[in-house]
Amino acid sequence: MAEEVSTLMKATVLMRQPGRVQEIVGALRKGGGDRLQVISDFDMTLSRFAYNGKRCPSSYNILDNSKIISEECRKELTALLHHYYPIEIDPHRTVKEKLPHMVEWWTKAHNLLCQQKIQKFQIAQVVRESNAMLREGYKTFFNTLYHNNIPLFIFSAGIGDILEEIIRQMKVFHPNIHIVSNYMDFNEDGFLQGFKGQLIHTYNKNSSACENSGYFQQLEGKTNVILLGDSIGDLTMADGVPGVQNILKIGFLNDKVEERRERYMDSYDIVLEKDETLDVVNGLLQHILCQGVQLEMQGP
């Protein structure tokens, strides 16, 4: 199968169990588009981690680096990042140990942002003026899913308003997209006063964070899943899907590559090391969808 799906021969692809990947891709192909849904993280998964050696901004960074944030606030947010990010990606701490730190980080950051008199109309401008970039091949990815009626569930611990605006400005915000994220709550005068619903951080991206969405229940029959993430916390994103039959987990290994490679290879079926494109995902989709059509035409 690895021979058939030429995209898996790419140098950035790591697989602990190629035979297992072969089986899963075969099952996804058999089910075709009718049975498939895609569940993805956003920051550093659909968006780029780096471009020309320079780090790209996350949905939070876009706001942090913008003109609408005071210098004072920016310094405080940067201090939080320097304190908590090493904890988030520390391979020697368990998720349980990291949890309280993540809640603390997100809560402090949200409180700082709420003091900034951010207005709803400013979001589009902030995104326009940022260095936000989606991964190479994003148009093919979003359009393929849309044209084949494959639901795309974006589960993000970032800022929903920002990432939605990025996708809109890239002209790929199609009706098959559903987003669960930290959405801003503006008061009647249009100023940011808080964030809606339950706080979503790196390590609670599971069914508990979106049980109220009822989203997966509507997708009965979509029992095959492609999951895309860039952190160990992303592995639970499909936990709310009832009756999953086949799931292919693809992980982008962007940072601290040496320290985290083994853990990622143990956790994800396919690991993409320092790969800033969606080539492998697009190649797999093409393979699954083409074969799905052929199988239908051939009959049982």
From Swiss-Prot:
GO terms for molecular function: 5'-nucleotidase activity; magnesium ion binding; nucleotide binding. It comes from Homo sapiens. Mg(2+) binds at residues 41, 43, 230. GO terms for biological process: nuclear-transcribed mRNA catabolic process, deadenylation-dependent decay; nucleotide metabolic process. This is 7-methylguanosine phosphate-specific 5'-nucleotidase. It comes from the Eukaryota. Substrate binds at residues 156-157, 205. Belongs to the pyrimidine 5'-nucleotidase family. GO terms for cellular component: cytoplasm; cytosol. Monomer. The active site is at residues 41, 43. It is found in: Cytoplasm. N(7)-methyl-GMP binds at residue 88. The modification N6-acetyllysine is found at residue 256. It is an enzyme of class 3 (hydrolase). SUPFAM superfamilies: HAD-like.
